[in-house]
């Protein structure tokens, strides 16, 4: 770390909860401490949640960003990749750790990795990372993009964004820096990141040739990849599917090639009128990544950047090539996931998942959104979360977040949180729709707290306790309001849940606690009214008495 940096980061537990650990036995007698966020309910019970925040929410942890986070136990560097070891029937320390995190069996984790339907991004040189899995059999994950640009940001700001994003649930981070101090920025992020870190090596390679794509070479790119592998990057986006013959297919698009990596490689192919060096040297690239157990994230350089271009010939031609490259990577023991679009209207989203599964041997799908409409700049975290929820239900394993600044500028701290929360909603909605084990438990716990007017429990169980409390307290800030049987929306007279509870209390008081009892009460009431009608001479209309 050659650059002096003094980041200011947020630490300490999330409101209403504490950092806790579950100890599980790993291979070779290693004890693994699996992190979780423990919510303390007013009922006296605890509710445990998946936690991505690392030591930053642990009040007992010593945080020194200049030193970095401690290495995880059980790390093995000389036994091959997670894919190779899974195929050999081995349950690694990472698999045991993940099984405890996901509430699944270690055998399931191993089998999904062995089949190529899940990946464990865990570079041997990133021991600070807490193991996680990306695959459709597991909870849908969320990636947060950070990184500087030539125009703005600093190392300190990007480290802060990383800590902030993981606090709110980012499962992985991608450092997409394109400005100054790319190597140093990545080093600070890696040494302090509790989650896997991904990159797009072509960005740094382009910076080395002063931004001229035509000056790129395989040798320069290869050395950049090795440099990043040595640092500890866990997965790399490689746009090896952008072939020379596919570039003309984008000519009539509304928005052309919108992927930075895709446009760089398209420019190189056209300038040299040769096939992409990423494609022609792919097997050598596999050998490099296998040495470090770095996961391929095969990039969708020809993804659609507008609704008009969704599911076109260029997009799916590249996807077919990514399927071919997937087979090659797996043959070299390298883990693979596939990147997906982009901008896709809702009725065309599922086709993307089905085709990816068919062409790419069910390798985990990792999608940017997709945005379901193009008309809402400043709200693209919403337009894309709509598409993200649909594609998650269909089988996408990881969602790359989109922030409100998409298409407008570099996201700041607030944008990062807004993007992460929007995508945690989409991911969880996808898990619910898939019937993922345990997904509904949190919904049930929060709904029960809502019905019982346990306001503090509602806040603590939510994705964003701080904002939930803030919104409630804007109109009812007094502490007694935290136990009140209403909020400022309906007030004490019109709260549907309070009225429902009153009805239930009345029913309980009068023994109406079953369908049979209610039916009997109804019959008795009808009989009473029938007798009353007879007593009045069976007359429909009675004279008015003064």
Curated annotation (Swiss-Prot):
One of its GO terms (biological process) is thiamine diphosphate biosynthetic process. The keyword Metal-binding applies. [4Fe-4S] cluster binds at residues 487, 490, 495. It comes from the Bacteria. Zn(2+) binds at residues 343, 407. It catalyses: 5-amino-1-(5-phospho-beta-D-ribosyl)imidazole + S-adenosyl-L-methionine = 4-amino-2-methyl-5-(phosphooxymethyl)pyrimidine + CO + 5'-deoxyadenosine + formate + L-methionine + 3 H(+). Substrate binds at residues 145, 174, 203, 239, 259-261, 300-303, 339, 366. Binds 1 [4Fe-4S] cluster per subunit. The cluster is coordinated with 3 cysteines and an exchangeable S-adenosyl-L-methionine. Keywords: 4Fe-4S, Iron, Iron-sulfur, Lyase, Metal-binding, S-adenosyl-L-methionine, Thiamine biosynthesis, Zinc. InterPro entries: ThiC, ThiC-associated_dom, ThiC/Bza_core_dom, ThiC/BzaA/B. GO terms for molecular function: 4 iron, 4 sulfur cluster binding; carbon-carbon lyase activity; zinc ion binding. Pathway: Cofactor biosynthesis; thiamine diphosphate biosynthesis. Its EC number is 4.1.99.17. Its cofactor is [4Fe-4S] cluster. NCBIfam families: PRK09284.1, PRK13352.1, thiC. Catalyzes the synthesis of the hydroxymethylpyrimidine phosphate (HMP-P) moiety of thiamine from aminoimidazole ribotide (AIR) in a radical S-adenosyl-L-methionine (SAM)-dependent reaction. Belongs to the ThiC family. This is Phosphomethylpyrimidine synthase.
């Amino acid at each position: 770390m050659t650059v002096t940096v003094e980041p200011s980061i947020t630490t300490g537990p999330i409101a209403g909860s504490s950092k806790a650990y579950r100890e599980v036995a790993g291979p070779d007698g290693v004890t693994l401490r699996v992190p979780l966020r423990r919510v303390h309910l007013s009922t006296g019970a605890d509710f445990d949640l998946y936690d991505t925040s690392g030591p930053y929410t642990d009040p007992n942890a010593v945080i020194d960003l200049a030193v970095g986070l401690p290495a995880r136990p059980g790390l093995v560097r000389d036994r091959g990749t997670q894919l190779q070891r899974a195929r050999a029937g081995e349950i690694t320390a990472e698999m045991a750790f993940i099984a405890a995190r996901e509430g699944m069996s270690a055998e399931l984790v191993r089998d999904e990795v062995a089949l190529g339907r899940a990946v464990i991004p865990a570079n041997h040189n990133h021991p600070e990372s807490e193991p996680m899995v990306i695959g459709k059999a597991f909870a849908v994950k969320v990636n947060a993009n950070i990184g500087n640009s030539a125009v703005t940001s600093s190392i300190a700001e990007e480290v802060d964004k990383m800590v902030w994003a993981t606090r709110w649930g980012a499962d992985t981070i991608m450092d997409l820096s394109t400005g100054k101090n790319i190597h140093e920025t990545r080093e600070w992020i890696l040494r302090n990141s509790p989650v896997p870190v991904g990159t797009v090596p072509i960005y740094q390679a382009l910076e080395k040739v002063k931004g001229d794509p035509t000056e790129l070479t395989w040798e320069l790119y290869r050395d950049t990849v090795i440099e990043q592998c040595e640092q500890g990057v866990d997965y790399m986006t490689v746009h090896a599917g952008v072939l020379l013959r596919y570039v003309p297919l984008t000519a009539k698009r509304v928005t052309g090639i919108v992927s930075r990596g895709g446009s760089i490689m398209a420019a190189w192919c056209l300038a040299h009128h040769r096939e992409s060096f990423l494609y022609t040297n792919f097997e050598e690239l596999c050998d490099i990544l296998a040495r470090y157990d770095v996961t391929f994230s095969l990039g969708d350089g020809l993804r659609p950047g507008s609704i008009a271009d969704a599911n076109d010939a260029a997009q799916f031609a590249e996807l077919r090539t990514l399927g071919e490259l997937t087979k090659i990577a797996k043959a070299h023991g390298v883990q693979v996931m596939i990147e997906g679009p982009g901008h896709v209207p809702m009725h065309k989203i599922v086709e993307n998942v089905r085709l990816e599964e068919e062409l790419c041997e069910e390798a985990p799908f990792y999608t940017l959104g997709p945005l379901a409409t193009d008309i809402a700049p400043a709200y693209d975290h919403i337009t894309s979360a709509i598409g993200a929820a649909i594609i998650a239900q269909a089988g996408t394993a990881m969602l790359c977040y989109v922030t409100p600044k998409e298409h407008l500028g570099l996201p700041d701290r607030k944008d990062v949180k807004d993007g992460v929360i929007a995508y945690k909603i989409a991911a969880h909605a996808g898990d619910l729709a898939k019937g993922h084990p345990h997904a509904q438990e949190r919904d049930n716990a929060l709904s029960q707290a809502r019905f019982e007017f346990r306001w503090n429990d509602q806040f603590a169980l939510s994705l964003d306790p701080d904002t939930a409390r803030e919104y409630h307290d804007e109109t009812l800030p007094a502490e007694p309001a935290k136990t009140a049987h209403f909020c400022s929306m309906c007030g004490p007279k019109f709260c549907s849940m309070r009225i429902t509870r009153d009805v239930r209390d009345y029913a309980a008081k009068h023994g109406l606690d079953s369908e049979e009892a209610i039916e009997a009460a109804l019959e008795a009431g009808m009989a009473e009214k029938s007798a009353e009608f007879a007593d009045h001479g069976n007359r429909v209309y009675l004279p008015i008495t003064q």
